[in-house]
């Protein structure tokens, strides 16, 4: 196994194996254990979803053809719960159209049974890189929301106007306040957002979901 697979992001997260075939679960758990990757097997999608609230973020290896609740239904349930962990789907040989359907629903990759250890670990390596990026983006959004929550109403109005591309003079006119007052609110806004530049402040605003102000009528 390449060193970058064994020592990279794979060792930092868990793999959740969802397959109704006990032999497949055992085989995959053995393979992942040999690669020093934490694995957690589930015999059904229902079992996984029941345990989901207590699980740490990880990669999901999902069989599409299962009784009671198939892989597509599991993916729908994850979307409803706003869980965006990377999903790799397992398909039978020649079931590429089925895999394509799964990828349209959000799966990041697919493997055909029987699959090689090298191919599967390669999929995991890419999936965990994606998970790391998503987690970082989530942290940035949360931090942006926390900082934006510190803004006063007037400071947020100034920020929304800046997002709309207005100058300080235009903001003063649209809000009916003096230019000096706009500059004061803008400075306070920058301090509360801990932004060192206007570009950084606007990026934080967008990550916090703040919408640009509407253009003044007339």
Question: Which sequence ranges carry the predicted segments?
Answer:
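C-terminal output helix
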Residues: 95-97, 111, 115-124, 174
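Acidic catalytic/metal-coordinating carboxylates
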Residues: 43-44, 70-76, 94
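Basic, Lys/Arg-enriched C-terminal extension of HTH/homeodomain DNA-binding domains
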Residues: 187-218
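Conserved acidic segment of CheY-like receiver
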Residues: 9-23, 28-32, 45, 60, ...
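Short amphipathic alpha-helix used as the core "switch/output" element in two-component signaling
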Residues: 50, 72-84, 101
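Receiver (REC) domain active-site loop signature in two-component systems and cognate sites
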Residues: 66
